[in-house]
């Protein structure tokens, strides 16, 4: 397992084959020729993937981050590629885009009350994926001023785009906030949710 506690993880390799865990409590970067994932890739911040060839996420493989910025030569997904944050995800495939798994934003609402309290958003905290956080609210007093908080990270506008054919037999949920563009052809026997669809 490759881990980064309070530090970004950066992985540069010709061929990346992951059946274990790659995890970061900050941002993570993967630069590769080919990426074959049947394990778990987690980032509490932004996960940036620059893969020149084929990216295979298979056998219930999981790629999850607060924000996804992924560029690949082609994509074959039968697992889960999930963004837990509210920013628009960015996924670009220069070649064919095959999806029979799940791609997109988390099914768990990010704001307001959770209508299904049994479902708790999972944000990675360690390589084993365990951890917890507790927030308690109290009224500030003059003797106990509120400390300023760090500003939230901002990210670029997102998109899902392929210059090849997009074949979706699974689920692509862009949260209705971003555009999906398939410049060659689109075959959809699954579910698509986007602000705009361009073929």
Can you name each region flagged by the protein language model?
Residues 1-4, 16-23, 36-42, 55-63, ...:
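Short, T/G/N/S-enriched strand-turn elements that build extracellular solenoid repeat scaffolds
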Residues 112-150:
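Long intrinsically disordered, low-complexity regions that are acidic and Ser/Thr-rich
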Residues 4-8, 23-29, 43-48, 64-68, ...:
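Short "repeat-start/strand-capping" segments in structured domains, especially the N-termini
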Residues 1, 109-112:
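Short, compositionally biased segments
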Residues 21, 29, 102, 119-122, ...:
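Generic short N-terminal amphipathic or hydrophobic helices
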Residues 154, 158-163:
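A structural motif corresponding to the C-terminal end of an alpha-helix
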